[in-house]
Amino acid sequence: MSPTALEVHDVAVKLATFVILRGISLRVPHGEIVGLVGRNGAGKTTTLRSIIGLVPILSGSIRLNGQELTNRPPHERVRLGIGYLPEDRRLIASLTVEENLLLPLWAADQDDGQNRLALIYDLMPEVKRLALRRAAALSGGQQKMVALARAVMAGRTLLLLDEPFEGLAPLLSRHLAEVIRALRDVAVLVTESDVNRMRLLTDQICTIERGEMVLEPGVGNSDASRIR
């Protein structure tokens, strides 16, 4: 197995008076894709948001290449090479596609935007064709593709993808899976509610239920279908 890029150990998250996550532990090696599968409300999104720093953790540790992330704000985590695709895409409608792609690098004060754009356009030529179009003019599928490209812009080391296939036609889902699998040397943690869609990407599947891990990657993956 490749060296570990992301290591989440015994993480708990409390929002208001509710403990949302309990004892979450997982690893994502460099160059590999790990899936996190669970019902709506199981804690998938909160897990990703805790890794990128959008929600604080109550206890435990989150490490990227051995560096503790717990006290680092989100923009510093982006500088370390973490890209995040939220489920709702969150493109800025008034900006062009290219401006949306550059946003995470601007926010993290990084100056290699043109090099990263060249990489994106090589990997996803359909995004290059949309570069000067306003985000408001894009279809839902195009928005999802651009949001993935924006995550890859920042995600030199780790990509966090929240329900990337949600709302997409099967053909576009397969294309998106091909793009994600084509990434080299990047660790990918992806969430899904449908284990069959997850298998478009990986057989390394964790299962989360009610904020707790119940299945680890590579262990009894066929049993994961029971959550559907």
Where are the regions a protein language model picked out?
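ABC-type ATPase nucleotide-binding domains, specifically the catalytic core motifs of the NBD
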Residues: 16, 72, 97-117, 123-125, ...
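ABC ATPase NBD coupling module
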Residues: 68-89, 93, 117, 129-132, ...
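ABC ATPase C-loop
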Residues: 151-152
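Conserved ABC ATPase signature
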Residues: 134-138
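The feature captures the beta-strand-to-loop junction immediately N-terminal to the Walker
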Residues: 37-39
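Conserved ABC transporter NBD signature motif
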Residues: 60-68, 80, 113-117, 215
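Helix-to-loop junction immediately C-terminal to a conserved catalytic motif
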Residues: 52
